[in-house]
Amino acid sequence: IFPALPANAAIITIPSLFEPTGEEAASMDWVSTPATLHCAPLGWPGIRSAMHQMTSWFHRADPALLICDVSAEVAQLARICSVPHVKILQHGDRSDPGHRAAYDGAAGLLAPFHSDLAQPEWDDAMRSKTFFAGGLGVDLRVAEREVARQRIGIDPDEELILILSGGGGEGFGQAPLGVGARTCPSARWITIGKVQRDWHATEPGNIEHRGWVDNADDYVAAADLVISSTGNTTCQQILAAAKPWLAIPEWRYFDEQHRKADALAAAGVATTLRHLPSSAHGWTSAISETWTRHRPDRQR
């Protein structure tokens, strides 16, 4: 997942903080988790090993800064070990004591999105220590539509509706997508990423599932309209391409994608629904609204 690294950079692999090894002591599960922590089960040797590796590295390397992605526990560990940290700021209801401790104890907050997508409850104190870095970690160069279509095998004059589902969840359901494709028979529907298979789905011939691809950016550049979830990378790619966009949040911890969808709607850069339309008339309305509300100048 990393590009070529410079000579002074190294990758240190640590055990998973979330996946069991089979050596966990389930007899300790009766002890409740305090409000200041999220994922801190007792009796997990993998967690002890990971924390040991990190604290040992803190001692050896004497780091000037740690950039912490999603773990409030690791952020608090850095602070306890006298290591300054910058915490990645994500959308969601993160008003709980665990997140607040990670944010309040941080030297700064790094938001991988534009400031227009900030949540309204983030106060001045929080925003004053936040650096908004839209496009962080994503190649936002957008191929010409015709070039992108050649790469993915789509004719220049075809209407293409792209359904993009990331890797953090189970993907969209096959049945509602089939209803949507039947509603727009003149368009070619292509899905990339995960799709939940439904035995009762009656798909028409104009929908195609391509699964995981290495060039999702080409598909976005080639599309006339995009339907997707609201993960960070997905959002940045679609906004950079300034496509008509129907955004459907998936389940994530702390309602991350739902709050991201709220922010996208408030900024006027996407049409959002809480779930995929469940009927032909629902799809007709959603797609019409997506075209009508498209504001490419706002997206860029």
Would you name each region that the model predicts?
Residues 65-70, 88, 216-259:
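A donor-sugar binding/catalytic signature common to diverse glycosyltransferases
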Residues 60-62, 105, 221-222:
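Alpha-helix C-terminal capping/helix-to-coil transition sites in glycosyltransferase folds
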Residues 30-75:
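Conserved nucleotide-sugar donor-binding subdomain of glycosyltransferases
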Residues 147-225, 276-277:
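Donor-nucleotide binding loops and adjacent catalytic segments primarily
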Residues 271, 276-299:
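Conserved donor-nucleotide binding/catalytic region of nucleotide-linked donor-dependent transferases
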Residues 1-46:
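Conserved nucleotide-sugar phosphate-binding/catalytic loop shared by glycosyltransferases and other
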Residues 80-143:
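Active-site-proximal region of nucleotide-activated glycan assembly enzymes
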Residues 1-3, 70-73, 114-118, 191-199:
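Short, polar loop motifs at secondary-structure junctions
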